[in-house]
Each structure stands twice: as structure tokens, then as C-alpha cells.
Regions:
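Accessory alpha-helical/coil subdomains and C-terminal extensions
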Residues: 243, 247-258
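Conserved beta-strand-loop surface patch within small alpha/beta domains used
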Residues: 88-146
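N-terminal export leaders
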Residues: 18-38
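Short beta-strand segments
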Residues: 111-113, 135, 162-166, 243-246
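Short HxH-centered metal-ligating active-site micro-motif
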Residues: 122-206, 214
Length: 258
């Protein structure tokens, strides 16, 4: 994932036939803190965690990343495979499926939006047993979402939480439009807008406001997670990292939001 984004807001373009076919195939078959390059601390060419016989804490062949840095590198490598059309679709084999009947040890929790264009397992090229995925429109938090996120680190020692926003987020767009017009949205959708509203960037106008608010919302959600005492204790002793990131629909790049 890239550390910082220099490009301004770009409307999402219609996917090409090749991309649509790839998405269908993936769905049916189925970065620590770098500067200017990938989400991982290692350079953009860094390889994913090397396969080897099953390691302690795993039930299948690929070694489970056990530190925040390893987890970030694996996500960065997976996103690189995705955006360059070199997906490996890992951890889908019959032996993996069988091994997972005895337990799971995902190496990252990804809190993402419900948007159908941003499925975490695909954009990070991961497979069964690799990720806890928690999805709510605009990455909005409530008690159920918080509990779902905390389960990985607190119960299974998952070393990484990623708050993943994305370009052209409909929930953020709706929240900004409701704020500007004063129009109330249907009941449950209004709740989402109310949660996003404090993060609206009023220093920008038009599409730039939506774009900036997408990033501001990710930062706010990440900060709230980092303030949770049980999670903060794990961050403090190095067992956990909580990072914000953003997926660009036009380039398929995931980059870090500082």
C-alpha cells in the first residue's frame, strides 16, 4: 500500500470487461509505515511471507505472519499482485479447507466499507483463514462492529487492524450531501450519516470535500480504535498495529493514510 496519496479525487470509472471477468472469477473461485511507496516498511518489491511447512499456530502450509510488520508486508504484497493481475488466490486448496475445520488464525482484521467493489480478500489477494473481515457502510463503528474487530487481537492474537476506506465512498458522499442540504435520509441510513458527519472536512468544496472526508473518516475511526484500552495495551507493547488505508478504484492501489 502506498504511504501517502498525491492524486486528487477521481471519479470511479466503469470496470473493463477483463476486470469484470477477473472479479467474477475471484468471487466464484473462491505495509508498515513506508513513505511514498508501499504500505509495507519494505520496498514495493518486497516478497510476501515465504511459504514453508506448517508453522506453530497455523493449520496449513503458508506461515502465518506473526508481527504487525510481517502482516503489513503480506497485505502490501497481496495488493501488488492484485493490481498487476498476478493473483495467487492462496489458501483455497482442499487441504487448506480441511485444516481450517480445526481452527483459524487470521493475521489481520480489515474493517472496510460494504461497497461491492472493495472486497478485502480480493484486493489483498488472500484466501480462507487469512483475514477477519468486518464491513459496515463508511466503516461506521457501533458495539457489534467494535466487538467483531476486537475479537481477532484479543482472542486469537491477530497482530494487525486495517481501517480501509475507498475512493468514491457512497456512505461518505451521502453524509456530505445531507450535511450540505439538511435533507434527512431514510432512518437507518441517517444513522450512518450522523456517525460520519463529525468527520466532514468543511475546508474543501464539492468533490474535494467528499474526497477529503473519506480520508478524515478513516483517521477518526482508526483513532477511536486506538483509544480502546484493550487494543491500546497491545499497541503499546508491539503486539498490534492499527493503521488507516485507502483503496483507489481507478488504480487498485491500497495506500496508507497517515
Amino acid at each position: 500500500m502506498n504511504a501517502d496519496r498525491s492524486a486528487g479525487p477521481t471519479p470511479a470509472s466503469s470496470p473493463t470487461p477483463a476486470r469484470r471477468a477477473l472479479l467474477r472469477a475471484g468471487l466464484t473461485g473462491a505495509a508498515a509505515l513506508g513513505t511514498g511507496v508501499a504500505l509495507a516498511a519494505a520496498p514495493a518489491s518486497a516478497a510476501p511471507v515465504s511459504p514453508r511447512p506448517a508453522a506453530a499456530g497455523t493449520a496449513y502450509g503458508r506461515r502465518r505472519p506473526s508481527t504487525p510488520a510481517e502482516a503489513l508486508r503480506e497485505l502490501a504484497a497481496g495488493n501488488r499482485r492484485w493490481r498487476t493481475f498476478r493473483e495467487q488466490h492462496p489458501d483455497e486448496a482442499p487441504a487448506v479447507r480441511q485444516s481450517l475445520t480445526s481452527g483459524q488464525h487470521p493475521f489481520a482484521v480489515v474493517l472496510g466499507c460494504i461497497d461491492s467493489r472493495v472486497p478485502p480478500e480480493l484486493v489483498f489477494d488472500q484466501g480462507l483463514g487469512d483475514l477477519f473481515t468486518v464491513r459496515s457502510a463508511g466503516e461506521v463503528l457501533d458495539e457489534a462492529v467494535l466487538g467483531s474487530i476486537a475479537y481477532g487481537p484479543l482472542e486469537l492474537d491477530t497482530p494487525l487492524i486495517v481501517v480501509l476506506g475507498h475512493q468514491s465512498c457512497g456512505a461518505v458522499t451521502a453524509a456530505v450531501e445531507a450535511d450540505e442540504t439538511g435533507k434527512r435520509l431514510p432512518a437507518h441510513i441517517q444513522y450512518l450519516a450522523d456517525q460520519i458527519a463529525p468527520n466532514i472536512d468543511h475546508t474543501k468544496e464539492g468533490a474535494a470535500r467528499v474526497d477529503a472526508t473519506i480520508d478524515a473518516n478513516v483517521r477518526a475511526v482508526r483513532a477511536r480504535l486506538a483509544a480502546e484500552p484493550d487494543l491500546a495495551a497491545r499497541v503499546a507493547d508491539g503486539r498490534l498495529a492499527i493503521v488507516g488505508a485507502r483503496y483507489e478504484l481507478t488504480t487498485q492501489v491500497v495506500h496508507r493514510i497517515a
